[in-house]
Amino acid sequence: MGTAGDRLLDIPCKVCGDRSSGKHYGIYSCDGCSGFFKRSIHRNRIYTCKATGDLKGRCPVDKTHRNQCRACRLAKCFQSAMNKDAVQHERGPRKPKLHPQLHHHHHHAAAAAAAAHHAAAAHHHHHHHHHAHAAAAHHAAVAAAAASGLHHHHHAMPVSLVTNVSASFNYTQHISTHPPAPAAPPSGFHLTASGAQQGPAPPAGHLHHGGAGHQHATAFHHPGHGHALPAPHGGVVSNPGGNSSAISGSGPGSTLPFPSHLLHHNLIAEAASKLPGITATAVAAVVSSTSTPYASAAQTSSPSSNNHNYSSPSPSNSIQSISSIGSRSGGGEEGLSLGSESPRVNVETETPSPSNSPPLSAGSISPAPTLTTSSGSPQHRQMSRHSLSEATTPPSHASLMICASNNNNNNNNNNNNGEHKQSSYTSGSPTPTTPTPPPPRSGVGSTCNTASSSSGFLELLLSPDKCQELIQYQVQHNTLLFPQQLLDSRLLSWEMLQETTARLLFMAVRWVKCLMPFQTLSKNDQHLLLQESWKELFLLNLAQWTIPLDLTPILESPLIRERVLQDEATQTEMKTIQEILCRFRQITPDGSEVGCMKAIALFAPETAGLCDVQPVEMLQDQAQCILSDHVRLRYPRQATRFGRLLLLLPSLRTIRAATIEALFFKETIGNVPIARLLRDMYTMEPAQVDK
């Protein structure tokens, strides 16, 4: 063994065989392997082994070759019993550097604290030593702060002192949680004042700098303090008294969850003004179908029951991310309790901004349809449990946007416990829901506050259905939707791939059906756009799901060649599919990027036969602008990322629908035309889907 002062031990690293520096995450390992493991867990990395054939997944991991294949190195870490739960996901902020002008204040404070500490320690018995020590240190710190006068000089503090609470946040959270003052609402949106703000109001000193009276968009109330602190992961902190504070204030002064330049208000307003109007029949149907729940909520809800609870979003827990604006689970009693253990925050997860709006009435609906409805209403979009899968979906949370085509009147208004009567889910106790038939027309305008109306289209793009979360969760956890054996492409059979592709097609159609801006178009335009873009949507879902897999052996097998034509055009398309999957694996788009790419592919104004082209073009432009801003802010060092993402879309369109149908769906649907299947799936009621 080495000497006491020597960190290196004679025990070898269990991963690479190098000299270990002690126990890390449960095993003896070197600093290199322990650091690699920590980074991989922190960033939720998914590596792919570049080896082929029998060598795939068997790369040597030793001192010399440990950096050559990260996938095999991470696998070796897990095989060596490294414990990922031992990785600390959160650390406190580093101590801020004191400004030179405040150095003498700090010096006097430290001297006073030391004197008080020694005085307190000398006047207590030994059996009370620990309690007295802590109390004396606390009082000494308070006395030192008062003596030094630091609390009278907030204006003189350096930035590192004022903002040290959020010093450990990553770049994307800083961007998404520091919005400017709210911009004026776009024309065509009907806004009303929302309900009272939950929790104690923060003092003026903690209001966002964007303007007086505007609370920080993601501030939460610390259990032991009266002021608001930034939420590290968008989570909810419950104080000992049992009151939980939501992420953002629901009052009229709440700030936007995204910077105003991300939202492109003019485009939203212009697109909204071009959308078709709402018929009186649809308005009457929606009002009549929702009047009872609204009245019930108004009579039974208390101020404490209107809190919106969000679990901490992250890619590692991506079921509860991306569109926490998303749906209520159709099988709430079967929902997974995923907890809130995420280490990283993405731009797309920092979007919740709930609002409590009054009931709808026929006279209060704006002629121009809005793209969102308020989260305070008891209306909830019904998430279908598709018949092709035994999978369950986890509980989602209070949403900003509710797809009117899949609304249901949630039974949470009549819960036995009387808490959260407007269906505020918690990750530990999902509540069952009862589906009801949708209204005749889904393009329904409703009231919303400034934040929800401005950011509505962005959040609608990010996953109105649970499709995006399910695929991304499968990519990272590989346990929810698809069989565990699919992790190894060598064990992936053709039958498994056929079953999986059928699920992916179903999820793509459900994503379209739950996209509210799409529902505002005419029925003819909806069917035309879906028929034109279904293969792009399916291929994007397939590419995202196959990120950790390699389908090359299956696509090049003789079994596949028998199912497609052997002409030159088909063979070229087969190669194009493999190239798309490979490029997708290299870029690894996040959930927001995939959602925007799907919207760009769906809203294709060049589609022949459209009744109204301009709204479609506006929605496509909006999706492109959101994608551009997201890439620029989320990946500032990847200047070519936006272009590479857009260049994937033309490649998708070069593949004929007949090739996709013959390759992936011939044995599943038989001789049924894909156009008829898509129409049936699209017009299927939620109650039929859940059977």
Curated annotation (Swiss-Prot):
SUPFAM superfamilies, per the entry: Glucocorticoid receptor-like (DNA-binding domain) (SSF57716), Nuclear receptor ligand-binding domain (SSF48508)
Regions of compositional bias (Basic residues) in chain numbering: 94-109, 120-133
Keyword match 4Fe-4S: no
Subcellular location: Nucleus
Region ranges (Repressive Function 2 (RF2), important for transcriptional repression): 172-265
Organs and tissues of expression: In larvae, pupae and adults, expressed in small subsets of cells in the anterior region of the brain. In pharate adult brains, expressed in around 20 large neurons located close to the antennal lobe and lateral protocerebral neurophils. Also expressed in a small cluster of cells located just below the chemosensory region of the antennal lobe and near the mechanosensory region of the antennal lobe and subesophageal neuropils.
Segments of this protein annotated with the region Impairs binding to DNA: 103-162, 172-488
Zn finger residue spans: NR C4-type: 13-33, 49-72
Classification via InterPro entries: NHR-like_dom_sf, Nucl_hrmn_rcpt_lig-bd, Nuclear_hormone_rcpt_NR2, Nuclear_hrmn_rcpt, Znf_hrmn_rcpt, Znf_NHR/GATA
Entry similarity comment: Belongs to the nuclear hormone receptor family. NR2 subfamily.
Stretches for region Disordered: 85-151, 176-253, 295-450
Task of the protein: Orphan receptor that binds DNA as a monomer to hormone response elements (HRE) containing an extended core motif half-site sequence 5'-AAGTCA-3'. Acts as a transcriptional repressor. In both females and males, functions downstream of tra2 to regulate the development and function of certain sex-specific abdominal neurons, and likely regulates the development and/or function of the nervous system that controls courtship behaviors involved in the recognition and response of adults to appropriate sexual partners.
Biased composition (Pro residues): 432-441
Any one annotated GO CC term: nucleus
Protein keywords: DNA-binding, Metal-binding, Nucleus, Receptor, Transcription, Transcription regulation, Zinc, Zinc-finger
PANTHER family, sorted: NUCLEAR HORMONE RECEPTOR
GO biological-process terms attached to the record: cell differentiation; copulation; courtship behavior; egg-laying behavior; male courtship behavior; mating behavior; mating behavior, sex discrimination; regulation of female receptivity
Name by which UniProt lists this protein: Protein dissatisfaction
UniProt organism field: Drosophila melanogaster
Source organism, top-level taxon: Eukaryota
Residue range(s) of DNA binding per entry: 10-89
GO MF annotation terms: DNA-binding transcription factor activity; DNA-binding transcription repressor activity, RNA polymerase II-specific; nuclear receptor activity; nuclear steroid receptor activity; RNA polymerase II cis-regulatory region sequence-specific DNA binding; zinc ion binding
SMART domains: HOLI, ZnF_C4
Primary subcellular site in the record, as a coarse category: nucleus
Chain intervals for the UniProt region annotation (AF-2): 674-685
